[in-house]
């Protein structure tokens, strides 16, 4: 009970139960799904499902909204590097995160509400063992992500793809090297790109969730992000001439360091949660 994660669950676990109608154990998956970037949310949702912390219906519901570009990519790579503005990156991240949270909240009414007394406390494995287990998982995820990005980058260099379609196919190069309005950029970031979608097809199959259902909610999230970004720009206007795209392309390596750290952190917390002895209070 004195462990850091138990404190985290006791302090914030009710957020996932009240706001998303999901078990308290889902809080870390949702949190790292938002800040860690795609496909972190899908990978951590898969961990929860395999450990029996959530059922297939809850897993499907998680996959409808637990999908976000994260702080490292949206704020740093898109905002700071591409638009020369961390502030603008924060606004883009907020438009995506709020879109995901809104969808998750609406879907919480789809199933019977969880009982208030249903929550978990854990007795953990050692930090050393958890780190040993988490690092290979994170490394494998980074390798898969990088492989898909390189593959789609090679395809886009070989095949002439119209610029408006590039972010739909491969989000990193499509958004960072494209020239789109800020609301449209937010929409593309929320969609995530086919390259990212392919990385989580195996997870969707485990949940018995069709890709078309996942795609539908990506489109809904994109529309919401578009209008949320327009709303943010209305209340916090920016001078577009100041935030013009950088003249040099964004290197993939400028994105992956932060993503790698967040993936390690996400897997580390997941191991602490899911390889422990569960007690229902």
Label the model's feature ranges.
Residues 72, 100, 182-275:
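C-terminal transmembrane helix pair
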Residues 4-8, 102-122:
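Juxtamembrane interface elements at the cytosolic ends of transmembrane helices
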Residues 131, 135-193:
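Transmembrane helical segments that form the transport core of multi-pass membrane transport proteins
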Residues 1-10, 18:
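N-terminal signal-anchor module of multipass membrane proteins
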Residues 16, 47-53, 123-139:
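Cytosolic juxtamembrane amphipathic/interface segments immediately preceding
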Residues 88-105, 260-264:
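Alpha-helical transmembrane segments
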Residues 111-136, 240-255, 274-281:
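Intrinsically disordered, low-complexity non-transmembrane regions of multi-pass membrane transporters
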Residues 20-83, 167-177, 183-207, 216-219:
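Alpha-helical membrane segments and immediately flanking helix-loop junctions
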């Amino acid at each position: 009970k004195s462990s850091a994660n138990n404190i985290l669950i006791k302090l914030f676990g009710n957020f996932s139960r009240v706001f998303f109608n999901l078990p308290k154990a889902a809080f870390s998956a949702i949190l790292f799904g938002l800040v860690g970037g795609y496909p972190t949310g899908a990978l951590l949702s898969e961990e929860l499902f395999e450990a029996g912390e959530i059922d297939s219906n809850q897993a499907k519901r998680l996959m409808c909204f637990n999908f976000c570009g994260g702080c490292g990519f949206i704020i740093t790579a898109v905002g700071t590097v591409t638009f020369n503005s961390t502030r603008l990156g924060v606004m883009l991240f907020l438009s995506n995160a709020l879109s995901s949270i809104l969808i998750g909240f609406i879907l919480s009414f789809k199933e019977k509400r969880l009982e208030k007394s249903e929550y978990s406390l854990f007795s953990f494995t050692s930090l050393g063992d958890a780190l040993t287990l988490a690092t290979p998982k994170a490394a494998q995820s980074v390798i898969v992500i990088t492989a898909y990005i390189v593959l789609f980058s090679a395809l886009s260099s070989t095949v002439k793809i119209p610029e408006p379609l590039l972010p739909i196919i491969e989000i990193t190069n499509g958004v960072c090297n494209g020239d789109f309005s800020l609301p449209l950029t937010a929409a593309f970031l929320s969609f995530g790109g086919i390259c990212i979608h392919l990385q989580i097809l195996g997870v969707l199959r485990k949940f018995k969730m069709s890709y078309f259902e996942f795609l539908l909610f990506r489109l809904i999230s994109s529309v919401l992000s578009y209008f949320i970004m327009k709303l943010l720009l209305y209340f916090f206007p920016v001078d577009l001439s100041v935030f013009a795209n950088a003249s040099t392309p964004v290197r993939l390596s400028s994105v992956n360091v932060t993503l790698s750290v967040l993936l390690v952190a996400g897997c580390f917390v997941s191991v602490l949660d899911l390889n422990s002895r569960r007690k229902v209070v």
